[in-house]
Amino acid sequence: MADSSFDVVSKVDRMEADNAVHQTQKEVEQRYDFKNVGASIEWSGDTILMKASSEERVKAILDVLQTKMIKRGIGLKSLEEGEPFASGKEYRIEVTLKQGIDQANAKKIGKIIRDEGPKGIKSRVEGDELRVSSKSRDDLQQTIALLKGADVDLDLQFVNFR
């Protein structure tokens, strides 16, 4: 029997992220507590920039964005938030979307699989994803459950289960 496998990836659906940013923008424009504070949200590339006249207002925009991201199925671990900083008369926060599994996290995930996972599981890095293989599908399902409960700084998805 051939080996079964799955891929561990960390990707953000850009359409869902775009929808969440647009919903946040619409809510910021309509809410009374954001009137006359210069509140805005912009998205370019993998960076979302929020602006407002006070630090509290810009944090409130971030909170609205996080709520919309969760409702659209995007985990908060895939957002890297900067600290609020003053720029002229306004405060700004930059949020970056994290995609892909970097080498350090790939090694960390591989170590978790080796140390705590069932015997006979093999993992290897392929670009920005991790391929996990085994002869037993049950072992792969146990590995998925293990990784879902593991403390990893990424929003992990499991794809291509064969």
Swiss-Prot record:
It comes from the Bacteria. InterPro entries: DUF520, UPF0234-like_C, UPF0234_N, YajQ-like_sf. The keyword Signal does not apply. The keyword Disulfide bond does not apply. It holds the Pfam family DUF520. Keywords: Nucleotide-binding. One of its GO terms (cellular component) is cytosol. One of its GO terms (molecular function) is nucleotide binding. Belongs to the YajQ family. Nucleotide-binding protein. This is Nucleotide-binding protein CMM_2802.
